[in-house]
Curated annotation (Swiss-Prot):
It comes from Whitewater Arroyo mammarenavirus (isolate Rat/United States/AV 9310135/1995) (WWAV). The record marks D458 as: Important for exonuclease activity. Residues 53-238 are annotated as: Binding site for the cap structure m7GTP. One of its GO terms (molecular function) is RNA binding. It is found in: Virion; Host cytoplasm. This is Nucleoprotein. Homomultimerizes to form the nucleocapsid. Binds to viral genomic RNA. Interacts with glycoprotein G2. Interacts with protein Z; this interaction probably directs the encapsidated genome to budding sites. Interacts with protein L; this interaction does not interfere with Z-L interaction. Interacts with host IKBKE (via Protein kinase domain); the interaction inhibits IKBKE kinase activity. InterPro entries: Nucleocapsid_arenaviridae (IPR000229), Nucleocapsid_C_arenaviridae (IPR035084), Nucleocapsid_C_sf (IPR038115), Nucleocapsid_N_arenaviridae (IPR035083). The N-terminal region is important for the cap-binding activity while the C-terminal region contains the 3'-5' exoribonuclease activity. A CCHE zinc binding site is present in the C-terminal region and may thus contribute to the substrate binding and/or the specificity of the exonuclease activity. GO terms for cellular component: helical viral capsid; host cell cytoplasm; ribonucleoprotein complex; viral nucleocapsid. It comes from the Viruses. Mn(2+) binds at D381, E383, D526. One of its GO terms (biological process) is negative stranded viral RNA replication.
Length: 562
């Protein structure tokens, strides 16, 4: 397929919707970094780098200047991506998903490498020809009249960067909104507020279309601060200090509230596999692909590259100059499924660790639990009895972090009764729930952590069954009616977080047990609504999943029937 068949903006909109759970509000952080740069950055060095980047040919000393300035910027910023190489294997993603990801990364690698070998002006493809061959080809092109003498620099023969180690160029380009805004303010002689207002309007336009140079010209009449943006088409590997339209659009995307802008995505190790899994789902739904044609990356290629560069940070807008390697270097797909040997039980004193989870999954659970903030209010709820729970959720309203998982019940008859009168979960939807997750989470909880619950008895029993008498519980003791004041609003706003409550819930015929609602009870959304009752309102902020969604269920074919 060719780039001409790519419906770019439709793909962008689909990616925004599909990855919306990981988009964040970054305006305050971006402006904090902007102020830090305005206070601490030497803009004489910035101007020097900008002049250098306008030259046709650059050498090692120029690269040193660019890298030194990038280091200075990185040291002043809070928003920066850290080197976090990711290793994906069967279990975190299915084998088919891993193969698809590996294939796309390889295609993207080939495309990027081809793009870097394409001539700067006439688009002549260099392939894997040596410099001697390229020079000779230029002479032949001149001989046959295709290329005029003296135009070698635009014919793709003379390199733009004449340096000893090309690998030092990696990750030294790409715009950073805080840098763009600070340069527009300082070098344009504008107030920070005027620059922010202009870029915000540009960002709002970006929610509906890709802004072009005509749009920029129109907006400039209202916002003179945008005059400093260069009236040039986007180029590959242009310096982040170049005030291009694409850099300004990226900055604008960070300054609007809403829109689920891809530029505001934040990645953490605990969410990485979930984001990749969701990306592949969106890709297949929209029939996206990696194009072999050299040139600018299409929306799918762009988000794939940025996500796979590092598993920690803001892929689009953070300072990334200190990351080594490229996306295909830093995200490694492993197909080796060799089993890890179980530890030998201790003979005298101490029992072997009994767990149904593989060590790598156990470690992922621990990292997810460690991401919780121990001093924040922490709601906890379960569905099902404490000795046979089918759903478990922890929710922290201040940070909007949550851990949520399911479990296949042992007592099927009792489960079906509870489904009918309470939680509405169907057996088929939890048939392949990964066993051992709830126990692993409880084992990993910090010592003496305090939880808040609506009804503490079942939670206390669950903790005690796991030997966690140290964990403390505060029971808010709301009435059934009080606890569900915000039920409809919570379900309307956050029902996408929980899709396993598909059954019909009916009122119990047992005397005195009529529920206050016939809506299904969800452990996660119950925690959200209980918290809303105490605070007096439902948050607009999207809760952030800490336990990767791909851990919740095992592949159906791996289910063992005894």
């Amino acid at each position: 397929m060719s780039d001409q068949s790519v419906p770019s903006f439709r793909w962008t909109q689909s990616l925004r919707r599909g990855l919306s759970a990981w988009t964040t509000s970054v305006k305050a952080d971006v402006l904090n970094d902007t102020r830090a740069l305005l206070s601490g950055l030497d803009f004489a060095k910035v101007a020097s780098v900008q002049r250098m980047m306008r030259r046709v040919k650059r050498d090692d000393s120029d690269l040193v200047g660019l890298r030194d300035l990038n280091k200075e910027v990185d040291s002043l910023m809070i928003m920066k991506s850290n080197q976090k190489n990711m290793f994906l294997k069967v279990g975190s993603l299915s084998k088919d998903e891993l193969m698809e990801l590996s294939s796309d990364l390889e295609k993207l690698k080939q495309k990027v490498q081809r793009t870097e070998r394409v001539g700067n002006g006439t688009g002549q493809y260099q392939g894997n020809l040596s410099n001697t061959q390229l020079t000779r080809r230029s002479e032949i092109l001149q001989l046959v009249g295709i290329q005029r003498a003296g135009l070698a620099p635009t014919g793709g023969v003379v390199k733009i960067w004449d340096i000893k180690d090309p690998s030092l160029l990696v990750n030294q380009f790409g715009s950073v909104p805080a840098v763009t805004i600070s340069c527009m303010t300082e070098q344009g002689g504008e107030s920070l507020n005027d620059v922010v207002q202009g870029l915000t309007d540009l960002g709002l336009l970006y929610t509906a279309k890709y802004p072009n140079l005509n749009d920029l010209k129109a907006l400039t009449t209202k916002h003179p601060s945008l005059n400093i943006i260069t009236q040039e088409e986007s180029q590959i590997n242009i310096s982040g200090y170049n005030l291009s339209l694409s850099a300004a659009v990226k900055a604008g995307a960070c300054l609007i509230d809403g829109g689920n802008m891809l530029e505001t995505i934040k990645i953490e190790e605990s969410t990485f596999t979930t984001v990749i899994k969701t990306l592949l789902e969106v890709k297949n739904k929209e029939k996206m692909f990696v194009s072999p044609t050299p040139g600018q990356r299409n929306p799918y290629e762009n988000v794939l590259y940025k996500l796979c560069l590092s598993g920690d940070g803001w892929p689009y807008i953070a300072s990334r100059s200190q990351i080594k390697g490229r996306a295909w270097d830093n995200t490694v797909v492993e197909f080796d499924t060799a089993t890890v040997k179980e530890p030998i039980p201790i003979r005298n004193g101490g029992a072997p660790l009994l767990t149904t989870l593989k060590p790598e999954i156990e470690n992922q659970v621990k990292r997810s639990v460690e991401s919780l903030l121990i001093n924040d209010t922490t709601w906890i709820d379960i569905e099902g009895p404490p000795n046979d729970p089918v759903e478990f959720a922890i929710y922290q309203p201040e940070s909007q972090r949550y851990i949520h998982c399911y479990r296949r019940p042992n007592d099927i008859k009792s489960f079906k009764d509870q489904s009918k009168y309470c939680h509405g979960i169907l057996l088929k939807d939890v048939e392949n729930a990964r066993p051992g997750l709830i126990s692993s989470i409880i084992r990993s909880l910090p010592k003496s952590m305090v939880f808040t619950a609506q009804g503490a008895d079942d939670i206390r029993k669950l903790f005690d069954m796991h030997g966690r008498q140290d964990l403390k519980i505060v029971d808010v003791k709301l009435s059934a009616e009080e606890s569900r004041i915000f039920e409809d609003l919570v379900w309307k706003r956050f029902e996408h977080l929980c899709d396993k409550h598909k059954g019909i819930v009916i009122k119990s015929k047992k005397k005195g047990s009529t529920p206050a609602t016939t809506n299904a009870h969800c452990a996660l959304l119950d925690g959200v609504m209980f918290s809303a009752v105490i605070s007096g309102s439902v948050s607009n902020e999207k809760p952030k999943r800490m336990l990767p969604i791909d851990l919740l269920f095992r592949e159906p074919e791996t289910t063992v029937v005894l």
